[in-house]
Every structure is written in C-alpha cells, then in structure tokens.
Amino acid sequence: MGRTHLFTSESVTEGHPDKVADCISDAVLDALISQDKNCRVACETLVTTGVAFIAGEITANATVNFPDIVRDTIRRIGYTSSDMGFDWQTCSVVTSIDKQSPDIAQGVNEGDGLFKEQGAGDQGLMFGFACDETPELMPAPISYAHKLTKQLADVRKNGVLDFLRPDGKSQVTVQYEDGQPKRIDTIVISSQHSPDVTYDELKDRIIAEVILPVIPGELLDEQTKYFINPTGRFVVGGPMGDCGLTGRKIIVDTYGGMGRHGGGCFSGKDPSKVDRSASYMGRHVAKNIVAAGIAKRCEVQVAYAIGVAQPVSVMVDLMGTGRIPEADAERIVREVFDLRPAAIIDYLDLKRPIYGPTAAYGHFGRTGDSFPWESTRRADEIRGKAGI
C-alpha cells in the first residue's frame, strides 16, 4: 500500500477584509483600463473600521471617481449597514495617488530604455501549476475550499441564509492515497453572522446549505470532521474585526500551497506587471501540458529582469509524472509559447477590464471571459510536438 497523507488549503469570501481590499484595487484597475488600455496601475488598498485608503502609482488617460468606485465595491460585497462597522454609505475614503516612476516607465515602454522591446515591469520569479485532481486541473483542497466560500456568499446574497454577513473563511483537508485524493478528512467554515442566530441553527444550516450542495458525497464519510464557527461566535468581522490589505491572500489566490509561489500579488496591478501577467501565463502553460497528457502534475517557473523582454529563465518540473524528459518539455514550451511580456499581454488579451471577477474565489480553475489563461487551446500542439 502506498503512502497516505493529508493536505490542507483555505479560501476566504469576498467580505474578508483582505479580499475587500483586493476587490477595491481591481475595481480601480478595471475602471482605468476600460478607458485607457495602456494605463499603468499599481493600486494598493487598506480597509479598517469605517475607513478605506487607496494609494499607489497610476498613469492613465482616464477620468474616474475613486470614492465612488470604492463605495460601489463595498456595497456589492454586502457591507450595507453601519452595525457591521463598515458601511459603503458612511465609510471615509482617503486617496493618495502618484504617477508611475519615469525610471520604471522607460524600461516598460516600447522604444524607451536600454532595450527597445517592452520589458518586464520588474524583476521577479513567477510560478504556474496544474494537476489532474479535478476537471479544472487544480488541486482538490483549494478547489473545494473555493467552492465552499463561493457558496457561503451565494446563500447570503440570495437570502437562503439571511443571518450570514459578508466575512467568512473555509478550510479543507483532503486525504491522499498514492498521490490521489480519496476523501475529505476535515472541513472548517467560519462565517460572520447576525447576533440573533443560535449556534446550533447556524451549524446545521451551513452544513445543509453550504457544504452538502457543493462537496461530492463520495468524498464525505462518517469520519469526516466538521468545524463550523469553532469559536462559537463570529459577529464582529470584516474590516471592523481585522484590518485588510491588498495582496495578503496570495496562496488563496493561487494553488492553496500546492505548488510554489514567487511572492508577488495580483490585484491592483495592470498586465505590464509580470507578477500578474506572467503568473497567468505560467498557469496557462502548466495547464496545457497536463491537458496534453504529458504529465499528471506540472509546475512552471519563469523569471525576468526589469526592462528586459526575454525571460532570464524558464523551468518545467513534471514532478515525477512526465511521459517525456523535462528538458524536452522545456524545449516544447519555448517553441509553443512566447513568454515576453508584450506577447503574453497580446496572447491572453489582458488589456481589458476583466480583473474584478478574479479578485475573490481564486484566479485559477475558473471559467468565463475573465479567465483566458484557463484555455487549453495549445494542448493538441504540445501533444504533437511530444509525439505521444
């Protein structure tokens, strides 16, 4: 019998304070890029009791009302009453916006700087990952954790569980045998709620309306453990309970800790920032390799120097599951995919207001127009070059 082990990943709802910040930052980006597709945006947000701060470096031929964007985002998330400690109508909005440094701009603008191609917006390393554990080629723990938090938000917004409030988290522990998910060992859900609901009702209703509708029944058994609001009470939450910052949930945003992370966040950054665009491309490359049947698991690393178009390194790790040598996989990646920043932006069509939906419930393993990197359109070409 092979090895049995547990692996855990977490997700958070859009009402978690760090996700409120991410949602605001990406709402600002979408508003700007919808008017100026070549805008340069690095928008950071901080939210706390009754206040939202936005700051950063923005260069754009656009006119936007930052306080209106902030308030509308907070309203859509669901902070609509002052008794939550954070209310879209009454919160203060403070802004401090500068222009992008000209020293950075000359390395990114095509035709400027030491190199004439559009270079990377910064140095850095980015990872992409895919595996065959789920239909969307994502790790099972983070996939199910996202499904739970999305369901938490849905049953709150549609009134099925009208005692829920926007802040919430999930955590899923999956038991693996021989590297494959076999069952769910533990589910943790913490959801902010109104003060008048009893603990027993909250626990029973969350199991019935959140967990059971989205987790496959064959993965649950009598030994599965459920921890629902395990402190017993979660009335104070959101920005009133914790200060929220853009970029504080980078593992939730990606692969739940399965697969490595280069450290750069995504939200509030226009696609000239390779932290975002190259991470999306890394996911696209890894997913197409797995979809092609070359490997069951794949991790891709790409790294850049600021102002330089060609990546300084490209690495493909098939994690012991490959049907071809990794050196051949790297060669195929370089032949099939153009990993220069401008080429990535053009290939994935990233100069569009598509970023708002990415800000909560994961940037990967999703469907729809906001997630072009999830396409497997190059799988057949990769399979052909691999000769399998």
UniProtKB/Swiss-Prot annotation:
Pathway: Amino-acid biosynthesis; S-adenosyl-L-methionine biosynthesis; S-adenosyl-L-methionine from L-methionine: step 1/1. Binds 2 divalent ions per subunit. Binds 1 potassium ion per subunit. Its cofactor is Mg(2+); K(+). K(+) binds at E44. GO terms for molecular function: ATP binding; magnesium ion binding; methionine adenosyltransferase activity. Mg(2+) binds at D18. It is found in: Cytoplasm. Its EC number is 2.5.1.6. It catalyses: L-methionine + ATP + H2O = S-adenosyl-L-methionine + phosphate + diphosphate. InterPro entries: ADOMET_SYNTHASE_CS, S-AdoMet_synt_C, S-AdoMet_synt_central, S-AdoMet_synt_N, S-AdoMet_synthetase, S-AdoMet_synthetase_sfam. GO terms for biological process: one-carbon metabolic process; S-adenosylmethionine biosynthetic process. ATP binds at H16, D167, G168, K169, R233, F234, D242, R248, K249, K269. L-methionine binds at E57, Q100, D242, K273. Its main location: cytoplasm. It comes from the Bacteria. Catalyzes the formation of S-adenosylmethionine (AdoMet) from methionine and ATP. The overall synthetic reaction is composed of two sequential steps, AdoMet formation and the subsequent tripolyphosphate hydrolysis which occurs prior to release of AdoMet from the enzyme. Belongs to the AdoMet synthase family. Homotetramer; dimer of dimers. This is S-adenosylmethionine synthase.
